[in-house]
């Protein structure tokens, strides 16, 4: 308003504003009055914002980023990939659903429709065309049944059902 009295021009309609949207008219009026008082030159203190506030803190939106319910409880499942020599597809199984090796081997036999047989420490998987192996956390391939079940279920990364002719490299008894 004081600005209009000095110049006697109505420039308010065409005025370009560099402020953020939502600022009040009161701040504009105070700046206009201060320009008139200092011969249309603003002082350094007048150019600074009166309210030096910190930027608003970023709060995380609840539910973002989206997490699948299957990934929320990682302790309740332990999925590993299962491959079979000659099969064109992979499967995944949850090791926590099985309590011991016989249950796991039975599930693998049903899944791939093959006969694996039972494991014997001295003979390995004799009498079977396929041998179940697994990769542990260190990247070593071992026969399923070589270690106690708890150690196996915690260290297994992948399962592979190999042809019996490929397995002698893992176990010298075959």
Curated annotation (Swiss-Prot):
<dbReference type="InterPro" id="IPR053793">
    <property type="entry name" value="PB1-like"/>
</dbReference>
<feature type="region of interest" description="Disordered">
    <location>
        <begin position="44"/>
        <end position="67"/>
    </location>
</feature>
<keyword id="KW-0927">Auxin signaling pathway</keyword>
<dbReference type="GO" id="GO:0009733">
    <property type="term" value="P:response to auxin"/>
</dbReference>
<keyword id="KW-0678">Repressor</keyword>
<dbReference type="GO" id="GO:0009734">
    <property type="term" value="P:auxin-activated signaling pathway"/>
</dbReference>
<keyword id="KW-0539">Nucleus</keyword>
<dbReference type="GO" id="GO:0005634">
    <property type="term" value="C:nucleus"/>
</dbReference>
<comment type="function">
    <text>Aux/IAA proteins are short-lived transcriptional factors that function as repressors of early auxin response genes at low auxin concentrations. Repression is thought to result from the interaction with auxin response factors (ARFs), proteins that bind to the auxin-responsive promoter element (AuxRE). Formation of heterodimers with ARF proteins may alter their ability to modulate early auxin response genes expression.</text>
</comment>
<dbReference type="InterPro" id="IPR033389">
    <property type="entry name" value="AUX/IAA_dom"/>
</dbReference>
<dbReference type="InterPro" id="IPR003311">
    <property type="entry name" value="AUX_IAA"/>
</dbReference>
<comment type="similarity">
    <text>Belongs to the Aux/IAA family.</text>
</comment>
<dbReference type="GO" id="GO:0003700">
    <property type="term" value="F:DNA-binding transcription factor activity"/>
</dbReference>
<dbReference type="GO" id="GO:0042802">
    <property type="term" value="F:identical protein binding"/>
</dbReference>
<protein>
    <recommendedName>
        <fullName>Auxin-responsive protein IAA2</fullName>
    </recommendedName>
</protein>
<keyword id="KW-0804">Transcription</keyword>
<feature type="short sequence motif" description="EAR-like (transcriptional repression)">
    <location>
        <begin position="16"/>
        <end position="20"/>
    </location>
</feature>
<keyword id="KW-0805">Transcription regulation</keyword>
<dbReference type="Pfam" id="PF02309">
    <property type="entry name" value="AUX_IAA"/>
</dbReference>
<comment type="subunit">
    <text>Homodimers and heterodimers. Interacts with the auxin-responsive protein IAA1. Interacts with TPL.</text>
</comment>
<dbReference type="GO" id="GO:0000976">
    <property type="term" value="F:transcription cis-regulatory region binding"/>
</dbReference>
<feature type="domain" description="PB1">
    <location>
        <begin position="77"/>
        <end position="164"/>
    </location>
</feature>
């Amino acid at each position: 308003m004081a600005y209009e009295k000095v110049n006697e021009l109505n420039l308010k309609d065409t005025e370009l504003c560099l402020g953020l949207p939502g600022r009040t008219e009161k701040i504009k009026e105070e700046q206009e009055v201060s320009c008139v008082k200092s011969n249309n030159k603003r002082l350094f203190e007048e150019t600074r914002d009166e309210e030096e506030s910190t930027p608003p803190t970023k709060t995380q939106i609840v539910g973002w980023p989206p997490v699948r319910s299957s990934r929320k409880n990682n302790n309740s499942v332990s999925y590993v990939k299962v491959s079979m020599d000659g099969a064109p597809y992979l499967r995944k199984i949850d090791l926590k659903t099985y309590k011991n090796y016989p249950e796991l081997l039975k599930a693998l036999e049903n899944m791939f429709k093959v006969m694996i047989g039972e494991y014997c420490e001295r003979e390995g998987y004799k009498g079977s065309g396929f041998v179940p192996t697994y990769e542990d956390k260190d990247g070593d391939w071992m026969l399923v049944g070589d270690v106690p079940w708890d150690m196996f279920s915690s260290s297994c990364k992948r399962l592979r059902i190999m042809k019996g002719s490929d397995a002698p490299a893992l176990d010298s008894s075959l």
